[in-house]
Swiss-Prot record:
This is Maleylacetoacetate isomerase. Its main location: cytoplasm. It is found in: Cytoplasm. Residues 7-95 form the GST N-terminal domain. It comes from the Eukaryota. It comes from Emericella nidulans (strain FGSC A4 / ATCC 38163 / CBS 112.46 / NRRL 194 / M139). Its cofactor is glutathione. GO terms for biological process: glutathione metabolic process; L-phenylalanine catabolic process; tyrosine catabolic process. Residues 104-226 form the GST C-terminal domain. It holds the Pfam family GST_N_2. GO terms for cellular component: mitochondrion. Belongs to the GST superfamily. Zeta family. Pathway: Amino-acid degradation; L-phenylalanine degradation; acetoacetate and fumarate from L-phenylalanine: step 5/6. The gene is maiA. InterPro entries: Glutathione-S-Trfase_C-like, Glutathione-S-Trfase_C_sf, Glutathione_S-Trfase, Glutathione_S-Trfase_N, GST_Zeta, GST_Zeta_C, GST_Zeta_N, Thioredoxin-like_sf.
């Protein structure tokens, strides 16, 4: 793989998007410099030609890797979990891999399972696009989100209580943690009592101290409105 200096990394992102936050944290954790392209979901910019030209799903994030010398075609990844795995595989010499060593398939599967609870069971059914679609049916959007987050967190807690050290799987930050902490931010906004999930709460508190998490936090982005900034 080319060195980081040979590459131009671009992230299409929204400050409050948990999927975008996963990549912001991962890029910081792995010491990969990137340029942000803000996409305002509340203004519908995800459906703009600018965004759909790179992401036909009309979502964020989108990760684009370009060779500075244009010796190869750009790589465009439109799903956050795929992008996280790509960052692990394509930058093997960078610090802080997101998955355990390939020699430990059991631990790798565990990390992926925890990440998938967040990315597959919780996030898709509580994101803005779904909340907007269920609202006409009289659904209480806040209660909907809270119930589904709590169900997912209960599953995560049941697994992580046995696997956690300082973080979700042992004492090293993994892809599971990169997915968990943005979900915790969303849970707090939804009024979830994290005290019900002591392992998640403890791991989240440890993650909040990490510089990469601070850099990826929704309150610190270039498109974060002034009233929400730290």
């Amino acid at each position: 793989m080319s060195t980081n200096s040979d590459l131009r990394v671009t992230l299409y992102t929204y400050f409050r998007s948990s999927c975008s936050a996963r990549l912001r944290i991962a890029l910081a954790l792995r010491s990969i410099s990137y340029t942000s392209v803000p996409i305002n979901l509340l203004k519908g910019e995800q459906s703009s030609t600018k965004n759909t030209a790179v992401n036909p799903s009309a979502t964020v994030p989108t990760l684009i890797i370009e060779h500075v010398d244009r010796s190869q075609s750009p790589i465009t990844i439109t799903q956050s979990l795929a992008a996280l795995e790509y960052l692990d595989e394509a930058f093997p010499d960078n610090p802080n891999p997101l998955l355990p060593p390939i020699s430990n398939p059991q631990q790798r599967a565990l990390v992926r399972s925890l990440a998938s609870i967040i990315a597959c069971d919780i996030q898709p059914v509580t994101n803005l696009r779904i909340l907007q679609r269920v609202a006409p049916f009289g659904v209480d959007r806040a209660a909907w989100s809270k119930d589904l987050i709590e169900a997912g967190f209960a599953a995560y807690e049941a697994i992580a209580r046995d696997s956690a050290g300082v973080f979700s799987v042992g004492d090293t930050i993994t892809m599971a943690d990169v997915c968990l902490i943005p979900a915790v931010w969303g849970a707090e906004r939804a009024g979830v009592n994290l005290g019900q999930y002591p392992t998640i709460k403890r791991v989240a508190e440890a993650l909040e101290k990490e510089n990469a998490v601070k850099e990826g936090h929704w309150r610190t982005q270039q498109d974060t409105p002034t009233e929400f900034r730290c």
